[in-house]
Amino acid sequence: MPTITIISYFGFLLASIIFTLVLFISLSKIQLI
């Protein structure tokens, strides 16, 4: 099942990117205040 592995990999990568963006935005808001 290579397809499931690829989907899981991209899903994990997307989650990591979203988590990084949320963390970066949170830090930016804290600095603005």
UniProtKB/Swiss-Prot annotation:
Xref: InterPro entries: Cyt_b6/f_cplx_su6
Keyword set includes Cell inner membrane: no
TM annotation in the entry: 4-24
Statement: the UniProt record of this protein carries the keyword Transmembrane: yes
Keywords: Chloroplast, Electron transport, Membrane, Photosynthesis, Plastid, Thylakoid, Transmembrane, Transmembrane helix, Transport
Annotated localization: Plastid, Chloroplast thylakoid membrane
GO cellular-component term (any): chloroplast thylakoid membrane
Highest taxon in the source lineage: Eukaryota
Membrane topology: Single-pass membrane protein
Molecular function via GO: electron transporter, transferring electrons within cytochrome b6/f complex of photosystem II activity
One of the GO biological process terms: photosynthesis
PANTHER family: CYTOCHROME B6-F COMPLEX SUBUNIT 6 (PTHR37266:SF1)
Subunit structure: The 4 large subunits of the cytochrome b6-f complex are cytochrome b6, subunit IV (17 kDa polypeptide, PetD), cytochrome f and the Rieske protein, while the 4 small subunits are PetG, PetL, PetM and PetN. The complex functions as a dimer.
Its biological purpose: Component of the cytochrome b6-f complex, which mediates electron transfer between photosystem II (PSII) and photosystem I (PSI), cyclic electron flow around PSI, and state transitions. PetL is important for photoautotrophic growth as well as for electron transfer efficiency and stability of the cytochrome b6-f complex.
Record-stated family: Belongs to the PetL family.
Protein name (Swiss-Prot/TrEMBL): Cytochrome b6-f complex subunit 6
Gene that encodes the chain: petL
